[in-house]
Amino acid sequence: MRIVDRESAEGRRERITLVPETLDDLWHLTYVLEPGDLVAGDTTRRIQRDDDKMRDTGGEREPMWIRIDVNNVEFAKFANRLRVGGDIVDCSREDQLGFHHTFNVEEHDELTVEKVWQVDQLERLEEAVEAAEQPDVAIATVEEGQAHIHTVAQYGVEERASITGTTGKGEYARSRDELFEELAAILRRLDAEAIILAGPGFTKQDALEHIEDNAPEAAEKIQVVDTASVGDRGVHEVLKRGAVDRIQTETRVSKEAELIDELMERIGEGEKAAYGVDEVAEAAEFGAIETLLILDERLREERAGEGDWAVDVNDIIENVEQQGGEVVVFSHEFDPGQQLANLGGIAALLRYRLS
């Protein structure tokens, strides 16, 4: 994420002009933007005309500058874009005022966001800016006859390739070198800044030697990790062991896994923990929260007025921060986020037990 400009607006509002540079940045904006925000930028809009030439075509798209009052935000992950919809409140063409418009925000599109910024939202922007300097990580898990390549992004872990084939004897057997060469070719194409090579047994070491001989530029980026499995399970082992953390100073994935494990351990032992909005709100009032854990989707719903909590989520967050606590927003894309969802979407590690 790149911040282009910041300036004060009316009331407690602030206007920030920014440029999302990666798919991760678009994902971050999903949880920054909310109904009532003002979003502006250059876009195109289909204009209906009355002349005979255009009547049958449904109008043509014209470039214009538009500001909307946001009422809908959707991250279209597989389309690589963020859809931000709302009513037009300012426009370079006055005849478009009041109509609905949707920005299809893609990487490198500049937009200006005006709103009352919550502390956690500004922290999320800062996280996105800092993430631009962190290395991308590819995880290749390998065992005899198969290899899987995943990438770790802030919005989730994504499988990028799966290679399978018989590597035994026989006319139709696929040689190990052939499988290793395809693995090396994929890693070259991904051009990740760091690679973790994992799996059971000695196959990964043989794969590393092949990559060192045939793709030395990729081999320089590799760290080897022992795991009992490959594929999704192998990736989970890599994340849980903190291998990604050693490459990226701090990743959302590994931090959330560590925190949710600590929470579940404390709950199981009846230690300093709270979960569910009622328990957490009470703990926040007493200043007992050391770390607040909240699910991104639940936070968005509550702020948009779509949730069912009887307390204001912003009050909980402000109480925690005023008492020196940490707020961690979990991604629903990861397993730890799913575990948190099962606990009501909000929980806390406490400084002391309340009862």
Swiss-Prot record:
Superkingdom of origin: Archaea
InterPro entries the UniProt entry points to: eFR1_2_sf, eRF1_1_Pelota, eRF1_2, eRF1_3, Pelota/DOM34_N, Pelota_arc, Ribosomal_eL30-like_sf, Transl-rel_pelota
SMART domains noted in UniProt: eRF1_1
Pfam families found in the cross-reference section: eRF1_1, eRF1_2, eRF1_3
Compartments (UniProt record): Cytoplasm
Keyword terms of this UniProt record: Cytoplasm, Endonuclease, Hydrolase, Metal-binding, Nuclease
UniProt record, GO biological process: nonfunctional rRNA decay; nuclear-transcribed mRNA catabolic process, no-go decay; nuclear-transcribed mRNA catabolic process, non-stop decay; ribosome disassembly; RNA surveillance
One function term, GO molecular function aspect: metal ion binding
Needed cofactors: a divalent metal cation
EC number: 3.1.-.-
Primary subcellular site in the record, as a coarse category: cytoplasm
Top EC category: hydrolase
GO CC terms, sorted: cytoplasm
HAMAP family found in the cross-reference section: PelO
Summary of subunit composition and partner proteins: Monomer.
Record-stated family: Belongs to the eukaryotic release factor 1 family. Pelota subfamily.
Domain remarks in the Swiss-Prot or TrEMBL record: The N-terminal domain has the RNA-binding Sm fold. It harbors the endoribonuclease activity.
Function of the molecule: May function in recognizing stalled ribosomes, interact with stem-loop structures in stalled mRNA molecules, and effect endonucleolytic cleavage of the mRNA. May play a role in the release non-functional ribosomes and degradation of damaged mRNAs. Has endoribonuclease activity.
Name of the protein in its database record: Protein pelota homolog
